[in-house]
Amino acid sequence: MNNVKVPKIPGGGAISTLLKVGIIGGLGLYGATHSLYNVEGGHRAIMFNRLVGIKDKVYPEGTHLMIPWFERPVIYDVRARPYLVESTSGSRDLQMVKIGLRVLTRPMADQLPEIYRSLGENYSERVLPSIINETLKAVVAQYNASQLITQREAVSREIRKILTERAANFNVALDDVSITNLTFGKEFTAAIEAKQVAAQEAERAKFIVEKAEQDKRSAVIRAQGEAKSAQLIGQAIANNQAFITLRKIEAAREIAQTIANSANKVYLSSDDLLLNLQGMNLDVDAKN
């Protein structure tokens, strides 16, 4: 048996070489494809290492290297995103208020390793609902229901101030906080509508009174003008009888002009035109 020789396979060395090259090439291709990762615009990455855990370095946008299997990137979106919350709270005068809040939130990029250690990737769902609801209840309780309407901007500023401080404790930044809607109970809403109707009625009554006063002043001024006109006409008649003759001539001319423009032909005597030329005193007073 010891003298038995195994025949050599033709081309065995070439196959072995090709096999080695294939294995090495496959490992190289695997390493090349799994040792690179991309960080898109508006994102940041941190690295989890199986030996040391989360590294403190934050990786910016671009392509980066990692050790396959030993390292794994965790990518965060650091752009501001809207978050909507609705909460029902009691005001200082015990009115139930449903308030809607919109916040623009983003993680602090330089604190991403700490955020991952304490909150994980879904940090917003773990932090924002609790601190927003707590802040809304605390702030709304300081105002009456009517003040929430008239001082809405001040309420929004106070909510923003408290929320910004609370969120910073969790390494979360708030770029904007705004109240989107305020909804009150049926009784309070009915009271507000009744108050608005009363205010409108009061304004309408005020307008009517002012209009009546204006009409009264206009009537007085008109009466004074007519009295003055009558006085002047009386003085003119007393001073010169020809004034009456002039008025008669003007009246007759207006009547004649109206008849001339009419489609029907009418013949009137001078007496019908209020114009009695024979009875008129056309002589001018010598004094004039």
From Swiss-Prot:
Mitochondrial matrix side: 1-10
Recorded GO CC terms: mitochondrial inner membrane; mitochondrion; plant-type vacuole
Residue numbers on the Mitochondrial intermembrane membrane side: 31-288
Tissue localization of expression: Mostly expressed in proliferative tissues, including vasculature, shoot and root apical tissues.
Primary location group: mitochondrion
Keyword Ion transport part of the UniProt annotation: no
Localization terms from the record: Mitochondrion inner membrane
Bilayer disposition of the protein: Single-pass type II membrane protein
Main function: Prohibitin probably acts as a holdase/unfoldase for the stabilization of newly synthesized mitochondrial proteins.
Record text on subunit structure and interactions: Component of a prohibitin multimeric complex in mitochondrial membranes.
Protein name, entry field: Prohibitin-1, mitochondrial
Species per Swiss-Prot/TrEMBL record: Arabidopsis thaliana (Mouse-ear cress)
